[in-house]
Amino acid sequence: MSILNSDSPAALRHYRNLNTVKKGDSLISVKNNPVKYGYVEDKDIVRSMVVWEIIDLNEKINRPFYYNSDGLVASTKSLYQLLLDGVNDGSIKEVYKDEMFKDRMTKQEIENATKFVRVDDAYIERVNAGEKISEEEKQQYIDVYETKSENVKMLKIKGMWYIDRRDAQLKYRLLGIAAMGKDPASYALRGPNGEPLGNADELIDLFWVFYPSAREVLANAIVFNNKNLSSDLTFDDLLNARRFSSIIYRSENGYGTGNIKDYIPNDANAQLEESERIKNQILEMENDMWNY
């Protein structure tokens, strides 16, 4: 719903949350259905390669994934917040511990991965002593460390590049996505002088989402656009069109799976060169198809 047609800020936010617009006395749904993927049989795949990539949210082109706002003209969330909200409200159900999508995560496991509660020893001692502690006092003894959008600096994606025999074109299908952030428990690690001990650069995969299960949520979430606050580009559009910058860190082409850093250790420049080599190898698949 546009702010230009709104009677009040509260009504604007209310109808946005419902994915509806009010025209006269009628409410009209503006919910988007994601564009359906074409059905592809294994026999129609001539060549394929599965790749894992990292999207650095510090890069300018990737900022739309990071932007979190609750403005009137445009109300947007970061991709991480969208995924987390979808997981918590049950609209995204396919959530796993890693990119192999074997071990599902429970809501409690997801909460443990994104939130850490530290209880002061003094509180435990008072409880064990049988003292009654008010809610106000309790807050003084409890610290909650939570992974928020500003703490998620990178995303991981897993997808397949393939050539469809029916049209001989190189295509891409996104399979999974993960948010990377610090282990929230590391925020609570303090030295004798109160200095943080957690490694600021150490990021973990908070959770992996099987992408097809998240499409309906992402197809109804608008991406922040600083050139046009009324833009209707969705996260599903952005990801499927590959409008981002990324680095390949792992690939699988039928001969095995390998993390680049494992077979090219301790050499960042050589790892970047290998990532580019794999990108070129993907592009050459289509040329090889025509020369076959």
Task: List the model feature ranges, each with a label.
Residues G194-G258:
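A recognition module on extended beta-rich or small alphabeta surfaces enriched in W/G with H and D/E
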Residues E136-L170, K182-V223:
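Short helix-loop boundary/capping segments
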Residues S231-Y292:
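A cross-kingdom marker for long, charged
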Residues M1-V144:
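N-terminal Sec/ER secretory leader and immediately downstream segment
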